[in-house]
Swiss-Prot record:
Its EC number is 6.3.4.21. Disulfide bonds: none annotated. Induction: Not regulated in the quinolinate synthase mutant old5 causing increased NAD steady state levels. SUPFAM superfamilies: Nicotinate/Quinolinate PRTase C-terminal domain-like, Nicotinate/Quinolinate PRTase N-terminal domain-like. The keyword Transferase applies. This is Nicotinate phosphoribosyltransferase 1. It comes from Arabidopsis thaliana. Its cofactor is Mg(2+); Mn(2+). PANTHER family: NICOTINATE PHOSPHORIBOSYLTRANSFERASE (PTHR11098), NICOTINATE PHOSPHORIBOSYLTRANSFERASE 1 (PTHR11098:SF19). It catalyses: nicotinate + 5-phospho-alpha-D-ribose 1-diphosphate + ATP + H2O = nicotinate beta-D-ribonucleotide + ADP + phosphate + diphosphate. Pathway: Cofactor biosynthesis; NAD(+) biosynthesis; nicotinate D-ribonucleotide from nicotinate: step 1/1.
Amino acid sequence: MEKKENGLDGKQSGRVINGPTNPMVTPLLNDLYQFTMAYAYWKAGKQSERSVFDLYFRKNPFGGEYTIFAGLEECIKFLANFNLTDEEIDFVRDSLPGCEEAFCDYLRGLDCSDIEVYAISEGSVVFPKVPLLRIEGPVAVVQLLETPFLNLINYASLVATNAARHRFVAGKSKLLLEFGARRAQGPDGAISASKYCYLGGFDATSNVAAGKLFGIPLRGTHSHAFVSSFMSLDEIVDKVLRSSDGKSTCKDFICLVQTCLTKIQNSSSLQGIFSETNQSELAAFISYALAFPNSFLALVDTYDVMKSGIPNFCAVALALNELGYKAVGIRLDSGDLAYLSTEVRKFFCAIERDLKVPDFGKMIVTASNDLNEETVDALNKQGHEVDAFGIGTNLVTCYAQAALGCVFKLVEINNQPRIKLSEDVTKVSIPCKKRTYRLFGKEGYPLVDIMTGENEPPPKVGERLLCRHPFNESKRAYVVPQRVEELLKCYWRGNADEAREELEPLKELRNRCIKQLENMRPDHMRRLNPTPYKVSVSAKLYDFIHFLWLNEAPVGELH
């Protein structure tokens, strides 16, 4: 396959597609056996045979019954810029002792101008066995896409699903912040996690690089180190703060804060809760407020939450309020989050009531500290006053499940359907080039995803259709769809001038994810014993699967 202009420079129908986010995503991001197979195909004269591969997964992650599809954009960027440099070809030559120079010339001419990719829209809710991507093209080239595609989709879909599950358990009203950069598996793990957690429903990230690359909102304040770095109020040299409207100036903000702290101590509702607060902590809070008067949010558990952190924060927040600013809130990073958040809210509300400060009780309470799906669920059951959750380690590392397990299987070559058999029926592939549809019921929920042969007529609204389990003959049902949606759309058509789907902004992918999850039937979404979503094949495809299965399986002989 010769290099075409649109494959070489990432153009398709006049559009230029940038390369992958990570520059390490090159054709060498591959398993060696992809190159050994390419050489063997080439030696056998099979390298240009037209093949069809499906990329799919076999089981939903985290014990759930749904998955979020992510990573498609990076795959298309990889395709659009696919080519091997001379240096890379030299390395392949050295890695394949005895390979002919003509094979290196063949590699030098490769691009993806003869590849077609059909995919489900990124950000969609997807299910096992259904192809996420269908890749068509010369078999040797398609095999060189297998490892990069799996690498780009497996983690992206896994962490997006993890984020979606955290969003589901937290609820729509809570702010979810991804704090995982320091615990992620390397730089790319951190960047990818930030991107796909946002897609999966998180609101913001602490990762500045991800904010720059993808336009994700950034959130962050300070650490315990900032608080403990201060020793006394004497360290604050510049005590001046102009009012928010710029009309007046407070020449001694420290004095104003101390006055506010005394007011809190004398408040009828709060007497006896605290006495002397930690003055070095107060110095840290004042210093931070002077730097960020419009967005003051403090970490309050460095010393003691209720006896020091909260009174000190409230004193600074009241002082800011007198100058026309509104503090944002606090963060809790340790302790009993349900109890502490409730007590903090009571403290805020007492000040609002006693000192007549409007909306003081509505300030944000953020919780962090090794949170995960289970702990957020437990907090909900206990009752809490947390408005925002900062989640890191368990989210970005996908601690509950290490991998999604997407696979890349040949389903057709030279127009001949192929099947992969196994003693484990879950690993038997579904052969031939297929079309996939989502059928919706009367209540608007999706009922079933059905795969059909490429040339079968599509399901029609209002017409009764038999849906069969691919491998279990007793599992079957008639469906009368009220709406039919074809899932696989063309995202890459090589050197053809025909239309294809555009790559969408990350925010639109996020919106799709949120909307589709809202439209799922509740029993598919619940954490405990969710109902499996039905994935079926047409009656005609079912018959063909089992015909091919019997045809390819060797017949045993008993003696």
